[in-house]
Amino acid sequence: MNGFLMDTNHVIAWEARNPALIAKLEALPKNDLVYACAITLGEIAAGHEMTSGDLVRRHQVEQFLNLYVLPKEIAITLYTRSYYGQIMGRLWRRTPPAKPSVSTDSHLVNTLGVNVNDVWIVACAWEHGLILLTTDSMTNIRNVTPEVTFENWLV
């Protein structure tokens, strides 16, 4: 599959008509497609639910997602779990917890600063051979996923 997978920050920037991002999107060849995965859309939905925000603005974002993003949504599949598992295993082996009794979530978040949703998004990009567009550093994840190309189009 050719194309790009947008992380949440790029989808939000797209909806906000970020000039740098829009210029890159408009310069893409017609056969290069831009996608978002279910995890990214879930993060946006969670953001809506966790804020009391402006309902008019929320509706505008939902309209944008329905028109431009949802038709290009990539679902999390049974195959995605394999890529997710490989990334998690690599993270664990690279920096195991000091104490065996430390939980996986605690170790990833508190020690490595890894957001589990980011692992899923990277797994989705890897599975489909897509370049991941993100502003997040994801340093520890990048260090264990040489198969994935990361780009930031918001600079």
Map each language-model feature to its residues.
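Alpha-helix capping/helix-boundary segments
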Residues: 10-11, 40, 80, 120-121, ...
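Short acidic-hydrophobic, aromatic-tinged amphipathic segments that line or gate anion-handling sites
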Residues: 70-77, 149-155
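Short, well-structured N-terminal submotif of metal-dependent ribonuclease cores
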Residues: 1-65, 92
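Phosphate- and divalent-cation-binding pockets in alpha/beta enzyme and binding domains
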Residues: 43, 83, 143
